[in-house]
Structure formats: structure tokens, C-alpha cells
Amino acid sequence: GQDYKGALKDMSECISKQNVNIASVDITVKESVSIAHFIVQVNNNRQLNRLIRKMTKLKNIDYVERAGR
């Protein structure tokens, strides 16, 4: 999404509120657009799907997807 102050904080808090651990994060910014890749530790698909739904509701988040299995 568009780069905005506090984006990493908002995403990290959202993940934490779902009782999910962040294993790693990689963020790149190109022309005021930020792309964040999180590796998270979840207990099951239900927890992951709930996290994805919550993340998509954050300010200026355009897209959230599961990258791998």
C-alpha cells in the first residue's frame, strides 16, 4: 500500500493481537509504495485466515496473501 507513518507498527500490533509470532519481516519501498513480507508462526489455518482478514482491514493495506505452505 501507499507508504504511511506507523505502517509497520500497525501491522505488528495486528499480528500480535491475534497471538501470532513474527519470525521475520522484510519491507521494501519503491516510489512511495511499501511491500511487506512477514513470516509468521500460526497454529492452524483458521488462525492464519483470521489474521489475513484482520490485516486487510488496516489503513492503506491493499492486498494480503498467503505466500507458501
PLM regions: where:
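A conserved regulatory-domain signal marking ACT and ACT-like small-molecule sensing domains
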Residues: 1-69
